[in-house]
Amino acid sequence: MSYDPNLGLVYIPTHEVAGIFVPIKGYYKMKPGTFNTGTDFYVNDAAATMSGIPPVTGAIKAFDPLTGETKWSVAHNHFWNGGTLSTASGITFQGNSSGRFVAYDSENGTILWSKEVQTGMIAPPITYEIDGEQYVAILAGDGGAGNSVGDNFGADKEIAAVLYGNEGRLLSFKIGGKSKLPVL
């Protein structure tokens, strides 16, 4: 999450996922080397067909902490998306699980720039300056497990981890940069 002091907005990568937890002793058994959360994802798959269970969603939301109002929101194809970076120039950056690194207008959420990077991103971007030139960098890759659970949370065919694999790498961008991203 990031904050723009000029606009007074907080940019939140939301992960809205319902989970079914069963408080029955012995129901869940720990399995070494697997995604041990205390829930059974196949039960969650079944729950997705039940009425009253909200859909799994992910978005970037611009939130006003003083009024409690969401000023704008951009929905993503999957819930597991990266952190955000907001700059003094009014741009908010975020990488998403579809493999796109996106620059949004911090005031209204308009997409200003987007780059396909062939892997999902969960890390927040950073910015730095060298010899008066500003760069934005992101550690790309699905270091967490959220994008590796596929069908259990839907939209599995639209996530970069399924389309390209999960190659981690550091990417750095600058205005006017000419380098081409190598294909993985």
Residue ranges: model-predicted function:
Residues 21-79, 85-88, 92-122, 126-184:
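Extracytoplasmic/lumenal domain signature
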